[in-house]
From Swiss-Prot:
Keywords: Cell membrane, Membrane, Transmembrane, Transmembrane helix
Keyword Oxidoreductase listed: no
Pfam family of the protein (one): UPF0154
Membrane topology: Single-pass membrane protein
Statement: the UniProt record of this protein carries the keyword GTP-binding: no
Source organism per UniProt: Bacillus pumilus (strain SAFR-032)
Designated name of the protein: UPF0154 protein BPUM_1692
Chief location: membrane
HAMAP family reported for this sequence: UPF0154 (MF_00363)
Amino acid sequence: MDLWVVILVGVVALLAGVALGFFIARKYMMSYLKKNPPINEQMLRMMMMQMGMKPSQKKINQMMKAMNNQAK
């Protein structure tokens, strides 16, 4: 085989692998976020009410900030 054919096949295979990997990772992340949605203020407020706490906006903001800092 000519050298340029080998190089062309290698580049095409590499691009196909990158594209396939991207779409597989995207599908995985979409399903993961659907199963485990990120916690927002409304969910936090409901959790606090279920635990018998009165959720003040200050307390919710503190908890959201703490969770965001922990995620970093």
